[in-house]
């Protein structure tokens, strides 16, 4: 019986892509550069590839945060230290939040039935502030970031830490997330039920099979209720 729900943060509760684009544009303008849509797409490819390496345990989070802009700034010809650009970008990102549709009302409903948690490889300060600003922190019992845990999703150690801290068995939990390689793999390997949040209805051509799939948060309550 499900008692606890782990939510991924970026791309699941928060429409991170919208926030990311605006923060990039603001950072570019601050340093005299109008960043185009095409350039944002270049950044997203660089950033995504680095986070994949992080999820695979090949590089550290700090390396991701700096190296992504080291490469990107060279490509767009902006002569700014990547550490400086990253700092400004994160400050702006902290102030921005765009919720995925139906998140607030769904969390409010689910919080009356389950214990809700956030599990993320995101930055601790950023996540905590965004949850507060988005008025979601009231529904969330605890936040587990890779920074706090010392391991990152999808590692077994990350989820073991979470389960131990909430005193729960794997079959009492479900993880809801948009990443097959991070959220769903981590849940499967930890024995946790998995729900793939797939709002863009992307085809799953991998061998990673979640227990359930939703494209709208409004369907989550019934989906979890219907689990065996």
For each feature predicted by the language model, list its residue ranges:
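Glycine-centered short loops/turns at secondary-structure junctions
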Residues: 113-114, 191
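Short, conserved clusters of charged catalytic residues that mark active-site
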Residues: 101-102, 157
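Asp-based, Mg2+/Mn2+-dependent phosphohydrolase catalytic module
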Residues: 1-5, 17-18, 29, 80, ...
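Catalytic-core regions built around general acid/base machinery
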Residues: 102-113
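N-terminal helical cap/lid subdomain that shapes the substrate entry/recognition surface
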Residues: 2-101
């Amino acid at each position: 019986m499900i008692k606890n729900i782990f939510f991924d943060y970026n791309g699941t509760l928060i429409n991170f892509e919208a926030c990311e684009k605006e923060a990039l544009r603001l950072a570019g303008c601050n340093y005299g550069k109008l960043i185009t849509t095409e350039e944002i797409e270049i950044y997203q490819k660089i950033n995504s590839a680095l986070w994949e390496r992080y999820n695979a345990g090949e590089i550290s989070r700090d390396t991701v945060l700096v190296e992504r802009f080291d490469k990107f700034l060279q490509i767009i010809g902006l002569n700014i230290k990547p550490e400086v650009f990253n700092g400004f970008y994160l400050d702006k990102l902290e102030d921005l939040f765009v919720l995925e549709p139906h998140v607030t009302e769904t969390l409010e409903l689910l919080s009356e039935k389950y214990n809700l948690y956030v599990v993320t490889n995101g930055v601790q300060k950023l996540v905590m502030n965004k949850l507060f600003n988005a008025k979601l922190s009231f529904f969330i019992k605890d936040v587990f970031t890779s920074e706090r845990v010392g391991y990152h999703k999808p590692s077994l150690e990350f989820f073991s830490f979470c389960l131990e801290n909430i005193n729960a068995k794997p079959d009492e939990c479900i993880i809801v997330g948009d990443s097959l390689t991070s959220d769903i793999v981590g849940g499967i390997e930890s024995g946790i039920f998995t729900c793939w949040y797939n709002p863009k209805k992307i085809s799953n051509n991998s061998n990673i099979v979640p227990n359930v799939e939703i494209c709208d948060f409004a369907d989550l309550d019934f989906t979890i209720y219907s689990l065996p």
